Regions:
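Long, amphipathic alpha-helical regulatory blocks in the mid-to-C-terminal portion
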Residues: 1, 63-66, 72, 251-252, ...
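Flexible helix-coil transition and linker loops at the boundaries of alpha-helical arrays
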Residues: 1-8
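An aromatic- and glycine-enriched ligand-binding surface/loop that stacks and positions planar moieties
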Residues: 12-13, 21-228
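Active-site beta-strand/loop architecture of penicillin-binding DD-peptidases
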Residues: 217-269
């Protein structure tokens, strides 16, 4: 168990979770395989600096045991839990809000360990804070197409570009809707992909406003095509923001939303 005075400090739950994470990496094919991840011929691989020189099934057993110990302790002691969407029939906006507040709020029961960058977000203070990451100079590390395609459809079906293209549905890869007479913005929007995509990546057509104190998704959509109002020529030139046609979304809230809120970087979450 823990309380607000322990946020940001190491707890037993955080230490146990870190052990699980380390053992998961150790057991993964990145380090644990019959051949080195980079082929096996590099100096680092020959000296066994970046892998074990072979496959060891016991590493997966140790990872499993550590995870069991963690969840047994969690079942006994409680406190940590996933942030849940509210309502009898949650909408995609509800799931997005639950996901967002699960990592961004300082007292979220999902957070097993977090670190501090700054006490609170004063926006224009010049401190190296979250808003500094969302300007043209700093936010040039954009998501890849491969990363975006990892997120499934909203019903859990894996996304497959070739199949979607063959079905003539590429224009539905992020959302669908209708244009009503006299309106310039899309109405009756249906988000077609896993809600976590829209909380991780800014995609074409995504409404620009997110809620902080309540569930809300609205505003003008992002125009990320070549010549669009947001991307401009960046995606064509593969430079600056939207260089890949996408942008990072996490910790990306408006100045009025995040103003004077406590800031943290989540190192370990229960969902991990």
């Amino acid at each position: 168990s823990t309380n607000s005075t322990n946020t940001g400090h190491w707890t037993k739950a955080g230490a146990m979770a870190l052990k699980c994470k380390i053992l998961q990496f150790a057991a993964s094919p990145l380090f644990n395989d019959n051949q080195g991840f980079a082929g096996g011929s590099s100096e680092a691989e020959r000296q066994l600096l970046v892998w074990y020189g072979g496959y060891r099934s016991d590493l997966w057993t140790r990872c499993l045991e550590a995870c069991r110990e963690f969840f047994n302790a969690l079942n006994s002691n409680g406190f940590y839990e996933l942030n849940q969407a509210t309502g009898a029939t949650p909408t995609q906006a509800d799931y997005r809000y639950a996901y967002r507040m699960g990592y961004i709020e300082l007292d979220s029961p999902e957070v097993l360990h977090s670190v501090r960058v700054h006490g609170y977000d004063s926006f224009g203070a010049g401190s190296y804070c979250w808003h500094s990451w969302s300007d043209n100079g700093r936010n040039s590390y954009t998501p890849t197409q491969e990363y975006v395609e990892m997120f499934p459809w909203s019903d859990g079906t894996p996304f497959n570009w070739d199949e979607t293209e063959a079905e003539g549905r590429l224009d539905e890869m992020f959302l669908t809707g209708t244009f009503n007479d006299g309106e310039q913005l899309l109405s009756n929007i249906v988000f077609t992909r896993d809600p976590r995509l829209y909380e991780s990546v800014i995609v074409n057509g995504l409404p620009g406003n997110l809620g902080w104190s309540s569930v809300s998704v609205g505003g003008d959509p992002y125009e990320l095509w070549v010549g669009g109002s947001h991307a401009g020529s960046n995606s064509f030139n593969e430079t600056m923001r939207y260089a890949t046609g996408y942008e990072n979304m996490k910790y990306y809230l408006g100045s009025s939303d995040y103003l004077r809120q406590n800031t943290q970087w989540v190192a370990l979450r229960l969902s991990d």
